[in-house]
Amino acid sequence: MNCLFLVSDEGYGHTVRQSCIANELAKRGAKITFQCRDPIPLATKILNKNIKIYNQFNLVRLVKQDGGVDVERTYNFFKNYITISKDWIKYMLNSPHVLNADIIVTDIVEEAGILSNELNKPTVAISHFTWHWLLRELDQMFEEIAQYLETCLSGISEFLYPPFSKRINQFPNPKPINLIARIPRKREYIREELKINDDEILIILAGGGTPVWRGIFNSIDINKNNQFVFLTDSSTISNNIKRVPKPFKLHDYINASDLVISRGGYGTISETLAYGVRHLILVEENHPEAIENANILRKVDHAMVRNLNNFLNEPYDLIEESLNIKMNLAPMRSDGHIQAADHIFKILDSFSSE
């Protein structure tokens, strides 16, 4: 089986989930081409060495400001989106690595539905949201583009969604799967590598390198509580915060931590839920996907949710509260990549027999 992966975002969660599925398929003998933009690089570190990475940007881009989405600048970027999208589709329809694929898997590049129809190939999407939903949440001025993307998505053969996905009724032919998270190394090994004592509390700051989060780094006084050790997955100008030695092994550090403080990205959420780690989500404005993630988790006691600006004013009070508040820490099943691989083989077999 030749399988083409189209990953629409260079962020942590998208790449990790799709890489887990690609590695599982490769383990079963599939030939994989993984198309993504990978400046971190992350995919190159976690993908099976036999998987070919095709380094190309896959369309959707949100312009960020202070952690949230800059709606006006994003809209300016999207003014010619439909034309750019159709040019991308035309290019893909004539690309050998696309023509040679037996099946397409995406996280969700909604235009993959057009490729599926035009090339008569099955396409599977695995995601917890869609871009057309997110654009509509941002502002009604994105409606034309949202309608276009929704039409593209209708060509998807099957849509696999993990727990706490949003607006499931918008997915074509939806099927539930479990969380997708990498298997971490043992907690005690990582804490020993990081030189964390048994009586110390390891806190991961996983929010990205935006100006707001750099302000958070600077708001922390390491001398206020010598029991706390702070790590981050981002560059930091604060001497109070240590940088994780290997960002592509963030799952190991999350598993070894006592508390994760994040902006509510689904990749970080998946790992805290899979490993049973306490989670403090700091909500930012103009970030619909993360805000919805936070609201869903708060309702089921899987995370504490507070306003990001509150943390700037009283970081240690919120840290103490999140370390002591009642929270559902039972680890959730995280074999969704195995379930996804099963679905992909089943869909291809069914398609081939028609």
Please state what every model-predicted region is.
Residues 7-19, 213:
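A short, glycine/small-residue-rich beta-strand->loop->alpha-helix junction that serves as a flexible
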Residues 69-103, 110-111:
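Conserved nucleotide-sugar donor-binding subdomain of glycosyltransferases
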Residues 93-150:
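Conserved nucleotide-sugar donor-interacting segment of glycosyltransferase catalytic cores
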Residues 104-108, 125, 249-292:
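A donor-sugar binding/catalytic signature common to diverse glycosyltransferases
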Residues 134-211:
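A nucleotide-sugar donor-handling region in carbohydrate enzymes
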